[in-house]
Amino acid sequence: MEHVVDVEFGGKMVTISTGKMAKQANGAVVVKSGDTMVLVTAVAQKEAKEGQDFFPLTVNYTEKAYAGGKIPGSFFRREARPSDPETLTCRLIDRPIRPLFPENFLNDTQIIATVVSADKDHDPRILSMLGASAALEVSDIPFQGPIAGVKVGRVDGRLICNPTADELELSDMEIVVAASRDAIIMVEGEARFVSEDDMLDAIFFGHAAVQPVLEAQEKLKQLAGVAKRDVPPPVVDQALLARVRELASERMSAAVKIKSKQERHNQIDLITAETTASLAAEFEGNEKQIRAFLGDLEYECVRADVLNSGVRIDGRDTVTIRPIATEAGLLPRTHGSALFTRGETQALVVTTLGTSSDEQRMDSLYGEYRKRFLLHYNFPPFSVGETSFRLGPGRREIGHGMLAERALSAILPKHDDFPYTIRIVSETLESNGSSSMAAVCGGCMSLMDAGVPISAPVAGIAMGLIKEGEKVAILSDILGDEDHLGDMDFKVAGSSDGITALQMDIKIGGVTREIMQKALAQAREGRLHILGKMAETLGAPRPEMSSFAPRITTIWVKTDKIRDVIGTGGKNIRNITETTGVTVDIEDTGRINIASTSKEACDLAIQMIRGLTDEAEEGKLYMGIVKKIMDFGAFVEILPGTDGLVHISELDTKRVKTVTEVLNEGDRVLVKCIGVDKNGKVKLSRKEALGLNPDGTPATDAPAGE
């Protein structure tokens, strides 16, 4: 039986229905707003796999080409591997729901969101976030929801819930907020130098906006009437737990205070191995349980130290930033490079400048578009002292790269002012927390090293949270272990003027406004400190670009002259590029970008293009070639494809009986344009050019009339 709930969400109607499609899934809903429809299903295995010790949640999001009335452009004409935007949406759905499953629920669980119809003004990503929660709510899968996501924009100081594409063009922020009844669960987005207070207002504007949608999910859950599965509480062997604590408590408390990541992990591994060996005979077959108890013990020791004494793993207090070292211009053949080191986290970041032909073509439900700024984040296994099989970037690398890309996009010059394609690659060389923020800091420095005229330097910092009851500690510049053992990972990037990007994930039920306000204020202090350290090495863009970077010169031609530049079958443009070695990009507007590392080659290409597109100007001198002799005058080619008539009366100051007395076909002759009629016919005069050089100066060595 189908159940339907309608709700107004940000001024637009949203319909959530269940019981009509995909009825063999544990939970399935169709979410519709405007002409956008998303089918979201939730399925969990009946039992957890034997020995399972983590929650295997998988989220898939697919935009079907037919949803936009298109046929896929791939060779096989069907949807292939997920695009980067689809991968990012998978993460967007996953992150807010993951902390809301019971801790001891370890069954394989899969959420699949399929966009089956799409229009431009109703974002399927937001509807998919809503659908994932709703599908879990109407299923028998245990879930501590509901939650919902909302996109928030701001135009002329007015906050907008789920803005349209046109509104986003004018907005100075685009953030996605996921929230429950009482708290914020996830935030991510970008902005143009928005203050901490304004960002906080936008986040909680989003929190208020999702409340009607949460009520609608609860109503749909009641209509569906599906009982939740029982999740038996975990069985704890109290005798084993007591023995583990007896043997390892003091040693673990000391181990978590070791500052070096590798030494600390080695000591914890040693404690684990020795404790397991000591208890092997007494508690045979319980090795996995012993390791779990030791993990809990590490968790408790780290958190207790921070909450009770304010001392962190590496001895810092809650606000201190790790030591920072920066270097710029260390790779001689690249266009821009920087090495950013913060504690045991290090990133080598490189900027490369290209032309519009290097832009990335992106295909979406709404058509093709091009990206001129790309940031790719790499996380090789050696950065954490491990080995693994590498097959392209994973979801985490794509997500971290996009966060850093958003952080830096706000400071880039406009395309008209700087017509380059920009690619930044961040190679994580060492990682002990905040590697994505190292990509932001190093990326900014590499842009400046490349001579990109950015509007302001940008830095990023990762904030953490440890919360037990009423005790709260907010941590600046968190370590990897503080991320793993803490309750929040809150990344904030921006300039001294405001925030350009942020991303927050939590592992608890949510965070309050007070916690977020303090975290944002503390993040600003840390960000300003990092910007100061970066400025000690490089505080502004270099005045000159690398000699290895292409120089792009922009010229304009009339749109009806574009075909003349290209030529039949591309003949002219091919001749220009082969002759000069430059790269030429022609836009439909008549804008032509010429890229070359050689000024001479660029000047020659401009001359050749001008020769193809210039039009005769009255009063201007031209050195032309006689193409045809007639009784009444001579036709002279003054520009490629442009002839003009020199009437017999304009050949000389004295009377000329026949044209051939003065000119013959193939002669080079200096002429002056004396007019262009309404039909484009050019009138030339040799007579008025006599006694002049081609540049218009008097030719003293040639008497008039010769």
Curated annotation (Swiss-Prot):
EC code: 2.7.7.8
Domain KH residues, every copy: 550-609
InterPro entries: ExoRNase_PH_dom1 (IPR001247), ExoRNase_PH_dom2 (IPR015847), ExoRNase_PH_dom2_sf (IPR036345), KH_dom (IPR004087), KH_dom_type_1 (IPR004088), KH_dom_type_1_sf (IPR036612), NA-bd_OB-fold (IPR012340), PNPase (IPR012162)
Gene3D superfamilies: GHMP Kinase, N-terminal domain, K Homology domain, type 1, Nucleic acid-binding proteins
Matches recorded under SUPFAM superfamilies: Eukaryotic type KH-domain (KH-domain type I) (SSF54791), Nucleic acid-binding proteins (SSF50249), Polynucleotide phosphorylase/guanosine pentaphosphate synthase (PNPase/GPSI), domain 3 (SSF46915), Ribonuclease PH domain 2-like (SSF55666), Ribosomal protein S5 domain 2-like (SSF54211)
BP GO annotations: mRNA catabolic process; RNA processing
Binding site for Mg(2+): D483, D489
SS bonds (residue pairs): none
Signal peptide positions on this chain: none
Sample GO molecular function, one term: polyribonucleotide nucleotidyltransferase activity
Top-level taxonomic group: Bacteria
Domain named S1 motif: residues: 619-687
Names of required cofactors: Mg(2+)
Swiss-Prot/TrEMBL catalytic activity: RNA(n+1) + phosphate = RNA(n) + a ribonucleoside 5'-diphosphate
Location relative to the cell: Cytoplasm
GO cellular component, as recorded: cytosol
SMART domains assigned to the protein according to its UniProt record, in alphabetical order: KH (SM00322), S1 (SM00316)
Family stated for the protein in its record: Belongs to the polyribonucleotide nucleotidyltransferase family.
PANTHER family linked to this entry: POLYRIBONUCLEOTIDE NUCLEOTIDYLTRANSFERASE (PTHR11252), POLYRIBONUCLEOTIDE NUCLEOTIDYLTRANSFERASE 1, MITOCHONDRIAL (PTHR11252:SF0)
Job description of the protein: Involved in mRNA degradation. Catalyzes the phosphorolysis of single-stranded polyribonucleotides processively in the 3'- to 5'-direction.
Name of the protein described by the UniProt record: Polyribonucleotide nucleotidyltransferase
Gene: pnp
